[in-house]
Amino acid sequence: MSTNPYVKFTSQQVAKPYLVFALILFVGQILFGLVMGVQYIFGDFLFPLIPFNIARMVHTNLLIVWLLFGFMGAAYYLIPEEADRELHSPKLAMFLFWVFAIAGVLTILGYLFVPYAGLAKMTGNDLWPTMGREFLEQPLVTKMGIVVVCLGFLYNVGMTVLKGRKTAINVVMMTGLIGLAVMFLFAFYNPENLTRDKFYWWYVVHLWVEGVWELIMAAMLAYVLIKITGVDREVIEKWLYVIVAMALISGILGTGHHYFWIGAPTVWLWVGSIFSTLEPLPFFAMVLFAFNMVNRRRREHPNKAASLWAMGTTVTAFLGAGVWGFLHTLAPVNYYTHGTQLTAAHGHLAFYGAYAMIVMTFISYAMPKLRNIGEAPDNKAQVLEMWGFWLMTISMIFLTLFLSAAGVVQIWLQRIPEDGAALGFMATQDQLVLFYWLRLLSGVIFLIGLVVYLLSFRQRARAELTAEVAAGHA
């Protein structure tokens, strides 16, 4: 049992460095996003120090890695409690934390300070070519390191579940985590045929974010809702199974909407369009799930900020992944919209709503306990955190709207006219500068919201110190 009265098991404390490091990487991701926002307007900004392609690579890689740290931290916190036993090996968890953190930092530094071709040569890409593909730019050694970390992580949490109590939350969480690791193995398959390459590339990208990651999100949300509402576990688990079934049925065959224009058989035009229309359903179910559970709550949990994050993530995920995804998922529409700023609008709101917000939901609930503060931080800290929530969420919604408007104009000028009348790509970009300024403004406000959110931890730190002093006098 734990010496910290607010966590059940001592080994749950290993979640803390994972969640803290996730937030540090999140800050880095936003800073590089702002660099890109300026570069869309002033193309030579920070050139040649940080070219646009490098800034984008760092921005997207930091997104992936900080979310993985968040998922791992959440797993290390909730799985021991759900399994009703200590984590199998806290020492292994801490060892893997340092391996993953050091490898991640070195990879980002490699992107920034070593020419990409030189980095590929240094890391053995000629022996097993895996680099150069969007989102999978990591050197071979980094990819292999990710596999090692995933295997060690799955062994650790898997043994905890096998030796402990099995719950729906544990089973769904483990299914999502195993799927995450298995799908990543396709990152090592890089065929010369471009159609085949793209076909399997989407196994990693789509089946992560619109497949197994949804399972992880649903398990994390269910766990937090049980804790903050006091609703019967059986009720929440029934909802969880329905959401998981919807996510898998729609998500797996929904991969087809990425196969429209890569040279795949025409059957994917139908399969992708039909099943992609079902993909908003699990996110809509999460909205109903969260609000229904909060309305049926049996207790007033003192952590109001965690409740706000829990409800906010479902609504924003439904808007970003559901509504904005559906807007351009049908093949006749996607013919004009794919690869435009409308795609970027969908990606930003979906990732923020579904995955960034669920990690921050979990941090909001778990961090006061991990820091021995109590069920919730003081009222000032919660008010500050909720200000951060609203600033980040509203600015992201406006950023999405501005990118959507840019996408519509881009389609109107570049895609719809016949070849002779259509503007070229760069000429079209010149017509979108106003929207890029508005997007940059939204990004700056988002950063302000993130800073406000992080400042709430200073308030918590004072409460933490007070708790430690009180414990010392006891």
Q: Across the structure, where does each feature detected by a protein language model lie?
A:
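Extramembrane terminal tails and long inter-domain/linker segments of multi-pass membrane proteins
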Residues: 1-16, 371-379, 409-433, 460-474
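Juxtamembrane interface elements at the cytosolic ends of transmembrane helices
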Residues: 1-3, 150-162, 191-195, 216-231, ...
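N-terminal regions that are enriched for targeting/export leaders
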Residues: 3-53
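Interfacial and helix-entry/exit segments of alpha-helical transmembrane bundles
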Residues: 15-25, 88-101, 169-179, 230-250, ...
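Membrane-interface helix-loop-helix modules in multi-pass inner-membrane proteins
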Residues: 34-41, 47, 54-161, 186-192, ...
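Transmembrane alpha-helix entry/boundary detector in multi-pass membrane proteins
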Residues: 49-64, 202-210, 265-276, 307, ...
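Hydrophobic cores of alpha-helical transmembrane segments in multi-pass inner/ER membrane proteins
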Residues: 61-75, 141-156, 209-224, 277-291, ...
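Membrane-embedded translocation segments of transport machinery
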Residues: 201, 205, 218-335, 343
